[in-house]
C-alpha cells in the first residue's frame, strides 16, 4: 500500500525511486501505469504524452522468435522504423537471434526499443539494471540519458544506489508506502545515512557532498595538490 503520495515526473527527468523490499515502489509504478486502481487520488498525464512500463522481467514482453520480429511487431510491421531502431540501439547484428539468447544488457535495449516503437514518451522501468555488469549498466544509462535529452520522462525503480547516484537527475526514497525524501542526487545521498553510496559513506567525514568514487578521487587529488609546498624561489 502507498499513502498520500504526490509524485511529479518532469519532462526530460530521469527519476530513480529507491527503497527496501515491500516499500511500495512497484505498487506505485503499477498504479501509475494503470495496472492497479488506487482507492483515492488520480494519475495525470500531460496532453500528448504516452506512458509505457517495462516490468522487472523484461523477457515477458517478448512474443516472437527473433529480435527482428520483435521490433517489427512493435513497429506495426513498418520495416523502416524497425531497422532504424535496431541501428540506434546497436541491435542490427542480433536481428536473427532469439530474444532469449541475448545478454542482459541487450535484453534491456530490445525491451526499451519496443516501448519507443510504441511512441512512449513516459517510461516506467522496474529494476532495469538487475543482473547487469558495469559495462551494460553504463550503456543502458547513456541510452536513457539520451532519451531524456530528447524530451522523454523516465521513472526507474531500483535498489542500485550507485547507478542512481551516477546517472539520475533526481532521487526519491520510499518506506512503508510513504515517500520520505526527494531531491537532486548529491543533496539526496549526502543527507541519508543508510541509503547512500559506498563512496559517500566512506568519505563523508572529509568530502560529505561526494557521492561517487570519481568525485572522491578528484577531491583527494585536489586536497593533496593544495597541500603541496611551493617550490623555493630565487
Describe the predicted segments one by one:
Residues 158-159:
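H-loop/switch region of ABC-family ATPase nucleotide-binding domains
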Residues 79-94:
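Conserved ABC ATPase "signature" region
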Residues 3-4, 195-234:
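ABC ATPase nucleotide-binding domains
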Residues 178-202:
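Conserved beta-strand-loop-alpha-helix hinge in the C-terminal portion
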Residues 133:
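ABC-family nucleotide-binding domains
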Amino acid at each position: 500500500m502507498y499513502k498520500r503520495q504526490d509524485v511529479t515526473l518532469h519532462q526530460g527527468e530521469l527519476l530513480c525511486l529507491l527503497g527496501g523490499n515491500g516499500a511500495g515502489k512497484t505498487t506505485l509504478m503499477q498504479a501509475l501505469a494503470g495496472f492497479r486502481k488506487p482507492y483515492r487520488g488520480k494519475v495525470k498525464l500531460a496532453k500528448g504524452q504516452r506512458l509505457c512500463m517495462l516490468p522487472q522481467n523484461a523477457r515477458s514482453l517478448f512474443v516472437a522468435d527473433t529480435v527482428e520480429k520483435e521490433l517489427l511487431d512493435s513497429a506495426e510491421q513498418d520495416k523502416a522504423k524497425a531497422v532504424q531502431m535496431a541501428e540506434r540501439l546497436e541491435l542490427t547484428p542480433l536481428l536473427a537471434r532469439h530474444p532469449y539468447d541475448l545478454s542482459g544488457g541487450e535484453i534491456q535495449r530490445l525491451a526499451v526499443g519496443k516501448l519507443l516503437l510504441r511512441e512512449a514518451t513516459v517510461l516506467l522501468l522496474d529494476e532495469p539494471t538487475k543482473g547487469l555488469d558495469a559495462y551494460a549498466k553504463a550503456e543502458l544509462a547513456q541510452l536513457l540519458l539520451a532519451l531524456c535529452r530528447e524530451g522523454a520522462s523516465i521513472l526507474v525503480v531500483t535498489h542500485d544506489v550507485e547507478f542512481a547516484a551516477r546517472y539520475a537527475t533526481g532521487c526519491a526514497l520510499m518506506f512503508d508506502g510513504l515517500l520520505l525524501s526527494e531531491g537532486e542526487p548529491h543533496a539526496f545521498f549526502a543527507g541519508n545515512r543508510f541509503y547512500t553510496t559506498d563512496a559517500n559513506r566512506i568519505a563523508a567525514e572529509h568530502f560529505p557532498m561526494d557521492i561517487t568514487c570519481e568525485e572522491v578521487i578528484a577531491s583527494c587529488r585536489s586536497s593533496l595538490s593544495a597541500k603541496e609546498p611551493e617550490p623555493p624561489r630565487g
